[in-house]
Structure formats: structure tokens, C-alpha cells
Amino acid sequence: MNLNATLFAQMVVFLVLAWFTMKFVWPPLINALDERSKKIADGLAAAEKGKAELEAAHKRVDQELAQARNDGQQRIADAEKRALAVADEIKTNAQAEAARIIAQAKAEAEQQIVKARETLRGEVAALAVKGAEQILKREVDQTAHAELLNQLKAEL
């Protein structure tokens, strides 16, 4: 093998090319690779952060939905309680009104009974006097008639 100046010149050119590449070409390539690596890492971190925020948002939405359901159920229960209370109040008022009407009707009936008794006493007394008059076949004077009526009323 013949080592001559060409081989030596090729080695010098290769070393110059390696030095030039290391000095001027390699740093921008490394920087570009580092920037790309950093962008990828930032993107992955942002994706993880977004995923965590999405999960947190889902949890908040689930909690708010559960709260809304609970509030709705509570409102329905309150409305049912109010409806039952109103129904009970209406029922109580109706019963009180019915009792009042019944008491009023009983009082009116009692008054009518008393009035009818008084009327009947008067009619019975008049009939008794008339019957007594017919039996005695004589005229009874007014004072005797009044006394007889009062006496018959008292007896009845």
C-alpha cells in the first residue's frame, strides 16, 4: 500500500470538513432537534394538562348534575308536602264548614220544632175549648177562654 500525499491531503480535507461541520452545521441541527424535542414535550404536557382539566370539568359537571337532580327532587318533595298541607287544610276547612252547616240546620230544625209545638199547643187548646164548648153547649166568656187556653198549654 502506497501512502502518498493524496491520502494525507484527503485526511486534512476530511478533518477540515469535520471541524467545519462541528463548528457551523452541527449546532443548528442540535438546536433544531432540541427545539423540536421541547415542542413535543410541551405538547405532551399540554395534552396531559388538558386531559386533567377535562376530567376535572367532567367531575364538576357530574357534581352539578347530581346537585341539580337533588335540588329537583327536593323541590318536588317540597311541592308534594305543600300540596298535602293545602289538601289537609281544605279538608279541615270543609269539615268545619260541614259541621257549621249541620249545627245551623239542627238549630233551625229545633226552632221549627219549637214553633210547630207552640202552634200545635195553640191549635190543640183551641180544639179542646171548642170541644168543651160543644159539650157544654154554652158560650164561654173571653177571660175564661184565655184561662182555659193557658191551662191547656201548660199541661201540654
UniProtKB/Swiss-Prot annotation:
Q: How does it sit in the membrane?
A: Single-pass membrane protein
Quote the subcellular location field of this record: Cell inner membrane
A GO term, aspect molecular function: proton-transporting ATP synthase activity, rotational mechanism
Q: What is the recorded name of this protein?
A: ATP synthase subunit b
| Similarity section | Belongs to the ATPase B chain family.
Asked whether the UniProt record includes Membrane among its keywords, one would answer yes
Domain of life, per UniProt, equals: Bacteria
Give TM segment ranges. Answer: 7-29
Q: How does it assemble?
A: F-type ATPases have 2 components, F(1) - the catalytic core - and F(0) - the membrane proton channel. F(1) has five subunits: alpha(3), beta(3), gamma(1), delta(1), epsilon(1). F(0) has three main subunits: a(1), b(2) and c(10-14). The alpha and beta chains form an alternating ring which encloses part of the gamma chain. F(1) is attached to F(0) by a central stalk formed by the gamma and epsilon chains, while a peripheral stalk is formed by the delta and b chains.
Q: What does this protein do?
A: F(1)F(0) ATP synthase produces ATP from ADP in the presence of a proton or sodium gradient. F-type ATPases consist of two structural domains, F(1) containing the extramembraneous catalytic core and F(0) containing the membrane proton channel, linked together by a central stalk and a peripheral stalk. During catalysis, ATP synthesis in the catalytic domain of F(1) is coupled via a rotary mechanism of the central stalk subunits to proton translocation.
Any single Gene Ontology cellular-component annotation: plasma membrane
| Species whose genome carries this gene | Burkholderia mallei (strain ATCC 23344)
Xref: Pfam families: ATP-synt_B (PF00430)
Identify the gene encoding this protein: atpF
Q: Which UniProt keywords apply?
A: ATP synthesis, Cell inner membrane, Cell membrane, CF(0), Hydrogen ion transport, Ion transport, Membrane, Transmembrane, Transmembrane helix, Transport
